[in-house]
Amino acid sequence: MSLQGRLICWFLRRRFLPATREPIDVARVRAQTAKRVWLPPVPKGWQLREQYRVAGAPDAANAPLSGEWIVREGGAPRTILYLHGGGYYFCSPKTHRAIAFGLATRAEADLFSLDYRLAPEHPFPAALDDALAAYRRLLADGAPAQSLVIAGDSAGGGLALATLVALRDAGDPLPAGAVLYSPWTDLAATGASIHENDGRDPMFCGDVFARIAPLYLGTASATDPYASPLYADLHGLPPLFMLAGSTETLLDDTRRVAQRARAAGVSVACGIERDLPHVWPIYAPFMPEARRALDDSADFVKRVTTADDSARSQRSVHGQMGPGSDAQSNAQRAAQSSATSIPS
């Protein structure tokens, strides 16, 4: 691990880990996060649009869906729908700009980071409803499914996988692939790594997820496949690119999904990196391992999606996309190509 990586793990162990042993205080966590958030500069040649109101939210009593666009000047040949982490109860597109900027610029993709509704005010399935509505809005605005990738980290990674399952079950066109960073896929917390890596994980104690899960679940079962996609039938999903650290308490949430997806015939590139912390790609401005992870992620995104530069169309202020071309036949080759360079 790099010196920067060791310093980040030291900081997490000293400042973040102790808080996970305390009772969950939603208001305090949100306030501290808002106070400490670091906003990276917008990359040269790109624009940040803090908007994309989606008319027709799933629940008319709630405000319309919103989020942030990071858009390449002149348009981009592909689109990423990004779902941020934060245990379903805190964080936002702003807290995840570093990972969104890094992935978008490397993948040459316009990226929409969804500001989905948070628990406990909006329990399951609110976040899933919002993710589905945002994906369908992207399609309605002209982004071909073959040029779309859904990505997410931690809770957002689990939400991304659940979104794929729900789209398949509903008969919607599926995206070209998905990128999942340290996804939280088992809200029942049955993975052996929850206990085996307790004390090794620099960020989380082992029992914190069992305390967070009820905030999101409400009255739903922890094994509902749309809340915990580890328990879903994974057949027919597009290629998956997954990363997790070897000392994560959530490690088995990645490993078991990779195993079950492969058994269901899904192409999976799964990298388990030694000692790296939860969702380390978010540290790309500071950490070389994070930059390499984003490079690999972007390569996957490019390989599974349409890349017809002649078909680019600049996005409007409301996020409307122009047409692209079909790259469905590239999907399986792309995931297999990525898998050869990333250990599983």
Question: Where are each of the predicted segments found?
Answer:
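Residue-identity detector for glycine
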Residues: G319-G324, A334
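Alpha/beta-hydrolase superfamily serine-hydrolase fold, recognizing
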Residues: A55-I70, G74-S313, G322, N330, ...
